[in-house]
Amino acid sequence: MKWLLLLGLVALSECIMYKVPLIRKKSLRRTLSERGLLKDFLKKHNLNPARKYFPQWEAPTLVDEQPLENYLDMEYFGTIGIGTPAQDFTVVFDTGSSNLWVPSVYCSSLACTNHNRFNPEDSSTYQSTSETVSITYGTGSMTGILGYDTVQVGGISDTNQIFGLSETEPGSFLYYAPFDGILGLAYPSISSSGATPVFDNIWNQGLVSQDLFSVYLSADDKSGSVVIFGGIDSSYYTGSLNWVPVTVEGYWQITVDSITMNGETIACAEGCQAIVDTGTSLLTGPTSPIANIQSDIGASENSDGDMVVSCSAISSLPDIVFTINGVQYPVPPSAYILQSEGSCISGFQGMNVPTESGELWILGDVFIRQYFTVFDRANNQVGLAPVA
């Protein structure tokens, strides 16, 4: 009987998962549009989502060319605490980057004044460093310092975690951003300044039983989405998980066999690379095939630069199918057409990223809302299954 009890306790310990609920909020793009500021923003900022991927690292100056404008369309956010006692921050859980940073009290930029700011003097566990960090984007850069403190993430106390404290955040548009900072969940190889990413630090301290995390993004307007650290909850998906090898341990990069519509190949005819990225809201790919897709679904550009379709046409549009590791993953029009306040916007965006392996696609939230996703660091693979 004692052995049975012990085995039961061991099994229970292996099933412990830490869940961080994600709240779906109005995107920065939508807020700017409602305030009549979007056109001016788009004029001043040359939006190029490609800058987020494969940046040119400059180690001596610790420069990371990761444009914050990439988060213009983000809608899913979670809360973390930093310090003792914890100071709360709303962050993007981003599998397309690796650093953690939040605004600090040292930041007097307009963008910082409307957000929570970390105060090191209010934390008994904060440790300062002499290191600085700069994230370059658009017309300026976010500059700051690096420090160490305890980070509370979904019930996990991640001690001695390095993170960035911003001192300047250019661009008044960030004043309206629905998030305070970014929590990166990609591999440490792309971390600016060599900072240990949050999940790596959590795993290294033995705080989770499995070296993986998983993501469920609900289509619900406000709640239901979650990041699960250290486990997989099968109630979020149907069928079984299909596993796809990571091809490059930097981003969560995988191979796509082909992309088809109505049974015909429309892109990626000889295979291509794709990054599974919770920090990108849309499905992005090379401008030429994306332009063809936009044409095929009847999308045209409006005055805000969005590609829109007739809402009445959605029911007649075809699925777009991504074949990955031999398994088909259809994305229906109800997923790739985003409906907002009477407008129906295409969830596809053109982006050219030169890579040694050819064209690159980004499977953002439009895709992840359809497929429960497991990011398995232990086996360097991504698991996908239809959401429940």
From Swiss-Prot:
Q: List the disulfide bonds.
A: C107-C112, C268-C272, C311-C344
Q: What is the purpose of this protein? A: Shows particularly broad specificity; although bonds involving phenylalanine and leucine are preferred, many others are also cleaved to some extent.
Sites bearing Phosphoserine, chain numbering: S130
What family does this belong to? Answer: Belongs to the peptidase A1 family.
Pfam families in the cross-refs = A1_Propeptide, Asp
Q: Which GO terms describe its cellular component?
A: extracellular exosome; multivesicular body lumen
Biological process (GO) annotations held by this record are:
digestion; proteolysis
Iron-sulfur listed as a keyword: no
The reaction(s) annotated as catalysed by this protein in its Swiss-Prot or TrEMBL entry are: Preferential cleavage: hydrophobic, preferably aromatic, residues in P1 and P1' positions. Cleaves 1-Phe-|-Val-2, 4-Gln-|-His-5, 13-Glu-|-Ala-14, 14-Ala-|-Leu-15, 15-Leu-|-Tyr-16, 16-Tyr-|-Leu-17, 23-Gly-|-Phe-24, 24-Phe-|-Phe-25 and 25-Phe-|-Tyr-26 bonds in the B chain of insulin
Name where it's found: Secreted
Catalytic positions are D94, D277
Sorted UniProt keywords: Aspartyl protease, Digestion, Disulfide bond, Hydrolase, Phosphoprotein, Protease, Secreted, Signal, Zymogen
What PANTHER family is this protein classified in?
BETA-SITE APP-CLEAVING ENZYME, ISOFORM A-RELATED, PEPSIN A-3-RELATED
Question: Is Lipid biosynthesis there in the keyword field?
Answer: no
Q: What is this protein called?
A: Pepsin A-5
* Boundaries of every Peptidase A1 domain copy: 76-385
Q: Where is the signal peptide?
A: 1-15
Q: Which residues form the propeptide?
A: 16-62
Looking at the record's lineage, which domain of life comes first? Eukaryota
Q: Write the Enzyme Commission number(s) for this entry.
A: 3.4.23.1
Any one Gene Ontology molecular-function term assigned to this protein's record? aspartic-type endopeptidase activity
